[in-house]
Design a protein with these regions (language model features):
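…and closely analogous acidic/polar surface helices at protein-protein or active-site interfaces
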Residues: 27-28, 38-69, 85
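Structural motif
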Residues: 29-31, 127-131
């Protein structure tokens, strides 16, 4: 409207144009790293994680954030969704994701790091978040990807005896930590660094 007010009844030219600074499309990338190993099948943790992904993707859709998804399990890692806009139909392509086998966390992180590094080259001003959804059942202790501005470890470990590996990863990486239960209860802002 301000451009039209400046123009009034005159012919439109460059001096009449008014610009409004806005945050660029996809100013934030949320890259999700989903543990699809056999241990996540126990207690329907993988199903809970996929439901949580749908909710987080829906939130990204409302916020016009960019999303990516890397799945790891069974000795391999796969980029299931390259960075792009979130859509309202996320459940359709998340539901068929299966699980089983070992927990190649380092391989998954390597794939996520590649996605984040490529995004950093194409959009250097974009803020890059890495969300690691895992039960932490791995003996690997990989380094955190340097290309992530923020890392959130969402811990799906359950049971009376817990190894605490998800929390240990968050501490090692200086990452934010939240349990799956706390995130499910709407505590998406209650995660905290390391503890």
């Amino acid at each position: 409207m301000s451009t039209l007010r400046a123009k009034r009844s005159m012919r439109l030219d460059a001096r009449h144009l008014r610009y409004r600074r806005t945050q660029g499309e996809g100013a934030v990338l949320h890259c999700f790293l989903l543990d699809c190993s056999g241990s996540m099948l126990a207690g329907e943790r993988l199903a809970r994680a996929k439901g949580m992904l749908v909710a987080l993707f829906d939130r990204a859709y409302r916020e016009r954030a960019t999303i990516a998804l890397v799945c790891f399990g069974g000795g391999r890692a796969e980029v299931r969704r390259q960075p792009g806009a979130a859509h309202w139909f996320n459940e359709r392509w998340i539901a068929p994701i299966g699980g089983g086998g070992g927990t190649p966390l380092a391989l998954g992180l390597s794939s996520a790091a590649t996605v984040l590094e490529r995004a950093a080259r194409h959009r250097p001003a974009q803020r890059r978040w890495l969300w690691v959804l895992t039960d932490g059942r791995t003996n690997e202790k990989p380094q955190a990807p340097a290309s992530a501005d923020e890392i959130v470890v969402v811990d799906f470990e359950e049971g009376s005896i817990r190894a605490g590996r998800g929390k240990a990863l968050a501490l090692d990486w200086g990452a934010r930590y939240i349990t799956a239960d706390a995130l499910s209860e709407g505590g998406d802002h209650s995660y905290h660094r390391g503890v």
